[in-house]
Amino acid sequence: MEKVLKKIILASKSIDRTELFNRIDIPFEVQASNIDEEKFKKRISDPILLVKELANAKLLYVKGELIKKNSQALIIAADTIVELNGIIIGKAKNPEGASKILKNLMGKAHNLITGIAISNTDDPKIIIDHAITSVEFLTLSDSEIDNYVKTNEWKGRAGAYSINDKASLFISKINGSSSNVIGLPMHKIYEILKNDFGLNLFHM
């Protein structure tokens, strides 16, 4: 039997993830976590394990805050990284860093890896999963990369680009979930909610 859910909490301050939820027109609220991501990145080198651990940590933080308030909700947390030849590529801190990352990715296939963690506030069960999408770029000139960096789309984004915006002009191939490149593998979330929590997003 399908269950009725009063509230979904997206444990992320990412505008791209918020936009993904807005597109499917279901009620949700955003509550960002406050964890030290660098602590995890220093001790975990495996990209899949890293995104899973970060997603779980974000979920536990928000879940704890909601439980303190006796708030009933289902929480969805996520973390996305870019991986190229086994090396984790994070978010650029400045335009120079963004340019360096993009030059490294040009003409190559790289992986977008997203870890997700989902749980109810009234249930200790936590479902953790991940998705991998391969993305390939065209080869751009230095001036084209400089022009893209000036758009500031790189800010706060893994791999220093956003598929939703002008970066779509130089993405030549995607193998896997396109929504995962944005920040959430929506097919995974749909399946987990349906199979593990008895929820159907078509009936929200």
Name these PLM-found stretches.
Residues 126-203:
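Active-site oxyanion/phosphate-handling segment shared across diverse enzymes
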Residues 35, 40, 89, 161-163, ...:
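Short clusters of hydrophobic/aromatic residues that line enzyme substrate/ligand-binding pockets
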Residues 1-74, 87, 140-143, 151, ...:
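N-terminal polybasic phosphate/anion-binding patch
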Residues 101-102, 115-119, 123-127:
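Anionic-ligand binding region
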Residues 21, 55, 79, 98, ...:
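Residue-level signal for inorganic ion chemistry
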Residues 17, 72, 81-84, 89, ...:
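Short, active-site-adjacent cap segments at secondary-structure transitions
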Residues 80-82, 112-119, 161:
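Short beta-strand scaffold segments in enzyme catalytic cores
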Residues 50, 80-110, 139:
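Active-site-adjacent loop/tail segments of enzyme domains
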